[in-house]
Amino acid sequence: DKPLGKVRIFGGSPELLYKSDETFGGCNTMFEISDHDIGPDREKMSAFINLRILTYDLNKDGKKEIIIVKNLSASGRLMRSVKLFTSSEVYNLEWDGLGLYENWKTRKIDGYVADYQVYDIDNDGQQEIVMAIVMATGGMLQGRSVVVYFKFNQPQPAAPEGGR
């Protein structure tokens, strides 16, 4: 029921090949199982709905990269029971046979990413990251959400040797 987790890589078997040092994910969306569903003698349970992890070949090298969100909490890891994410980063990670390395990440985004997808939103033939971002949540601030997209700055293929 933790909203943040480490990325784990398995090699087609139960054997763990890799576990990230950093935590990723994070979501303020959860559901509770009521006393009625579990009986009066049991403790209420809750579970967070984790964000998806996407895989795409964005750099067109024939290998899929991992596109993953890290929602950041203002309370950090000090208060585990408080899950209030206020900013985010999106990472592009790639497996090199030994571990995951970072190809790129976005700048820090104000608000937390509630969902995201890779899609050609402007019909220019290039994929973008489209994100649903929650800018403010409840409390004294009225909830506000936006949909934004980031263009990839992919390197262009080199010109052939010997001119054009």
Report each predicted region and the residues it spans.
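Beta-propeller-forming repeat regions
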Residues: 1-164
